[in-house]
Amino acid sequence: MDLQAIVTDTWNALADERGGGTPARYIPALAAVDPCKFGIALATDDGQVACAGDADEKFSIQSISKVFALALALEREGSALWDAVGREPSGDAFNSIVQLEKEKGIPRNPFINSGAIVTTDRFIGRRGVDEAVRDLIDRLRRMGRNPQIDFDQDVARSESEAGERNRALAWFLADFGRLLNPVEEVLSVYFRQC
């Protein structure tokens, strides 16, 4: 199987779709991203890498980071994590406050914003924000086999400045006793991560 040919053919097949999406407008740094940028990179477990398009461009992984936060939280908490966050589809918006209130502060799953805030809190644990941030970056660099992976400080700042809804979710979680750490500490990691 010619992995590079598959990736290139896929990239070419999607040529007409480039620019069809809309970057998040509520986060100013993301609103400025060129929607025509499109790259594919595929890495196999035996070390093969195939790339096409804008694959060498740095980009913000946004909610993809929630998978890595969940992995770190599960390593620290084990199955006890599922007492703090569910494993069910939400059926509501990714940033719903109403559902969080109805569910008494237990997010439906770790991939909606309230659930990701809880998993971020749990991978921070009691060790502190700086160590948690280093742990997450180290994990992303190892798994991506790329020592250049880092947080985009402009996007993090922009997320924080436009983060009223996520602050509301975090304060709801804190009010229900679901966070171990102060809200602003959890959000300082969450905004860098996501």
PLM ranges: what are they?
Residues V33-P35, L42-A43, I61-V67, I112:
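Generic structural signal for well-ordered secondary structure
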Residues A15-A52:
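A short, well-structured edge-of-sheet supersecondary motif
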Residues D46-G47, S60-W82:
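Active-site SXXK
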Residues M1-G19, E75-P182, S188-V189:
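Active-site-adjacent helix/loop patches that line small-molecule binding or acyl-intermediate pockets
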Residues D56-K58:
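A short acidic/small-residue loop/turn micro-motif
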Residues C36-V49, L173-L187:
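Acidic-glycine-rich active-site phosphate/pyrophosphate-binding loop
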Residues Q193-C194:
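Long, repeat-rich segments with strong aromatic
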